[in-house]
Amino acid sequence: MQKLHIILFLSACFFSINIWSQQVTVSGTVVDAKTGETLIGANVYNLEVRQGTVANNYGFYSLKLPLGDNKIKFSYAGYQVLEGNYFLTKDTVINIRLLPDTELDEVVITASNPQQNVTSTEMGTIRLSPNTVAKVPTLLGETDIIKTLQLMPGVQSGTEGSSGFYVRGGGPDQNLILLDGVPVYNVNHLFGFMSVFNSDAIRNVTLIKGGFPARYGGRLSSVLDIRMKEGNNQEFKGEASIGIISSKLTLEGPIVKDRTSFMVSGRRSYFDVIAYPFQKKLNNDNKNNGIETESWVNYFLQDFNVKVNHIINDRQKIYLSFYTGKDKFSLEDDNSFDYMTNENDFGLEWGNFTSALRWNYIMSNEMFCNVTATLSDYKFKFFYDYKFSDTYSKTSSESYIQYYSQVRDYALKVDFDYIPAFQHSVKFGASATRHSFSPGVTVIREESQYDKPVDETYGNVNLPAYEYVVYAEDDFSVNERLKINAGLHFSAFGVNNNIYASLEPRVSGRYLVAPNLSVKASYVKMQQYLHLLANSSFGLPTDLWVPTTARVKPQRAWQTAVGATYSLNNDYEFTIEGYYKKINDLIDYGEGASFFDLRKGNWEDLVVTGMGECYGLEFLVQKPSGKLTGWVGYTLSWSDRYFDEVNYGGKFPYRYDARHDVSITASYQITKNIDLGAVWIYRTGYPFTLSDEQYLSLTDMFISGGQQHGSAMPEVIEHFEQRNNYRMPDYHRLDVGANFHRTKKKSQRTWGIGMYNAYGRNNPFFVFPSREVDDNMKESVRLKQVSVFNFIPYVRWGIKF
């Protein structure tokens, strides 16, 4: 009997090996037939065995299939489906070029293919195309990726009009924002009213809110992965646009057809150009009228994207990409009176620079390799320079103060995709990053004839840190219904002879209840070694990036989520997700502190440490195709904070906690040349802190020698029982827009018009208490709000050629 068991076991092993040997590998790339652009996430599906995969971020796919006849379908949203019968006898390379479906000009895809969302293990993932972004009406008509993402459930916008975003109760520093794989530390133009991402230069946008794969790390709340266009390798193309704030120009084309291509895109505002002649005339008029005053106010924003890629051979490809962006504001005020001259100069500027050199190598039909070297540099600086001179007394003085901060990263990473069998898709890799921080450096210089000169520098001029990562994950099918993505992310961080390490498990899974219905669950652990000290005083870009130190621990979080996805005839997709997130070792300024206090102390002395708790439900209904497209999102959420030194250690709501958040986004194609867009938003008001008691105190009066001294003017002293103890009024608005297209010869021209806040709702930008006295001399305190963005129309013009 024992011999029989051995024979049966060996026979089963031989049979399994024989079956395994009957499989072959089909691999290749999927690209746009007209431009050569890789189609990220293209679907490759075997209709015979009902197994499939998706192309990676570089268009590469690999799929294990049985020997013999196979019917394979290649598809991508907005492109013609390609089906083919293939008789496979060995490993085969099939490179696919999909044609855009010209009959689908009206179709806008707001996320990935609905059926793919049902079958994948991904949770909390949103994908956007540039076409989607272009049809969403926005503030002043500036198409903006970030503002479109703010319309998704689980994503808060923060202050009205801003380009920051807050995911599932997390802070802005907890979003890993990648441009071609390079971290971007500041996404704001125009003091936050625009983002730095020029949508004309963008090919693909993916936001992950939960269930993070092991290949991502270093942040707690989300991953925003943005990929720039690679450039058309078939023919020269371009587009340009003129708006109220800025103008853009994008050019792309082949350097060597089918092998080498480029893409360049630039954007610049023109406030300084328009304002210059008016300011010059005003200064000349003052001079002619004997007023010795000269004033100049200037502001501009600009950014520039460049990408070049070259196909070395069928297995190798190289990319080089750059981004640089800058905001600069300056104020000069010079005046003279008799013998005296005063000169006041104020300046504020910030910007990002990123670059990436990437090499793709298809090592075999089962193995893909990507090696990347990157640089990311973010700088912020402001200065104030005051000069005084008196020619009569022959005296002069000068005071200069400068504050700046900087983060610079050099990184090298290698990533592998490995497909050992049709049930498995393995990703693994490693990276090393050198961070360089200048967290809040203040320079002060003072000179005069009567005082000793001052020349001092405060803060850390350069603080290096090193971060290392190793990860591995496997997306595998247990059976036809159950699929799991499991992985580990290991990281280590060293700064000032202190080393922190973290082993972070990641697991997510889906179970197919029916072919068009799945339930999903995930658990992830994350650790973040960088902190952002958000300035608590005003809205300038004075946020300070600081590293983990011996005194300040890394931020840690874990998140679990459950949900379900249902696709109705591939026309509608319904998603519901519930999540719970716990965050530890958050930092914030202590009560009353801000970056100005850095002059007299280290930033570590100004912060307090606490924790956060976030949970909620998200609902999303999408209609991704047809004449009417769009989505409806609803979020029910709670986000609380706990700091021992704040609020007596008690719980208080996060400043961007909103109980209810609703967004309805729709686009309707009336004809091929006319489309309409509308957005309606409703949100519970954000919390803010208001004193619950006020006292009058004669703080500068005292009695000495039997006499009263001081002004005896009362001063109001406020008592704050709790932080964020009041809420602003609820927020809602309607934005509408229309695009009119006209095709002439080889160009398409578009006029866009629209209205932001179409029904003129006075939403609060901020709220403040106001003391009022009535006719009976009775004093009361009332809340008043300041509204900035009422009814704002826009117009823009664009051309594609």
Annotated model-derived regions:
Residues 274-277, 673, 681-714, 729-735, ...:
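C-terminal beta-signal and adjacent terminal beta-strands/loops
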Residues 409-413, 458-464, 469, 553, ...:
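Outer membrane beta-barrel strand-and-loop segments of large Gram-negative receptors
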Residues 328, 379-381, 443-444, 449, ...:
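Surface-exposed extracellular loop regions of Gram-negative outer-membrane beta-barrel proteins
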Residues 96, 151-152, 196-235, 248, ...:
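A beta-strand signature from Gram-negative outer-membrane beta-barrel systems
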Residues 580-582, 605-690:
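Gram-negative outer-membrane beta-barrel transporters
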Residues 62-64, 135-137, 182-209:
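Short acidic/polar hinge/loop motifs at secondary-structure boundaries
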Residues 245-269, 287-331, 350-371, 420-421:
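Transmembrane beta-barrel wall of Gram-negative outer-membrane proteins
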Residues 31-35, 42-47, 75-79, 89-137, ...:
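Short, acidic, small-residue-rich periplasmic hinge/interaction motif at the N-terminus
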